[in-house]
């Protein structure tokens, strides 16, 4: 399997502060091998799986595993904690404005050979996020102790194309990555 970029091309693009999506792919017709790989990877901290399903029964086109986020944004009240490879920074701000800006700035050109979800921000918004939009009483006890919002930026994705029986190994190198 060959990677899609030479070392010189990579260095040149990175020096220009460009996001890069490095990948390699191969045909993999035995799905049980893919399932075994996924079971292994899902044991990793901060990993996730997206399984596309149609009409609740039929397996959809893609199975996506994401792992090794280089940044995680946690929102609690008006404090955003940014965890970049274990170094945490806190920012006091209006979370929804910050998140909208974050999403707008996440603009990565995906190579044509890859599925469109080959680079992503992923996360969740809890029910309590409504309190950032509307003034409603907060009488609930926070017994779960989870962030109101969590967004992560996975460096690695493994995507299996169920139609083409092809697996993609993807490494996202973001412009702010030190190499």
Residue ranges of each PLM-predicted region?
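Signature of the chorismate-utilizing enzyme
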Residues: 1-179
């Amino acid at each position: 399997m060959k990677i899609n970029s030479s070392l010189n091309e990579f260095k040149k693009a990175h020096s220009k502060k460009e996001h890069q999506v490095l990948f390699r792919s191969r045909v993999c017709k035995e799905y049980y091998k893919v399932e075994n790989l996924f079971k292994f990877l899902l044991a990793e901290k901060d990993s996730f799986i997206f399984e596309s399903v149609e009409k609740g029964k039929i397996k959809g086109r893609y199975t996506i595993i994401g792992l090794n986020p280089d940044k995680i944004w946690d929102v609690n009240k008006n404090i955003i904690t940014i965890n970049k490879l274990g170094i945490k920074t806190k920012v006091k701000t209006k979370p929804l404005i910050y998140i909208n800006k974050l999403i707008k700035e996440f603009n990565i050109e995906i190579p044509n050979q890859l599925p469109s979800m080959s680079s992503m921000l992923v996360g969740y918004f809890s029910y309590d996020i409504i309190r950032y939009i509307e003034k409603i009483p907060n009488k609930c006890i926070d017994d779960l102790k989870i962030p109101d919002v969590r967004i992560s930026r996975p460096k690695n994705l493994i995507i299996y194309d169920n139609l083409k029986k092809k697996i993609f190994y993807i490494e996202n190198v973001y412009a702010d990555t030190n190499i």
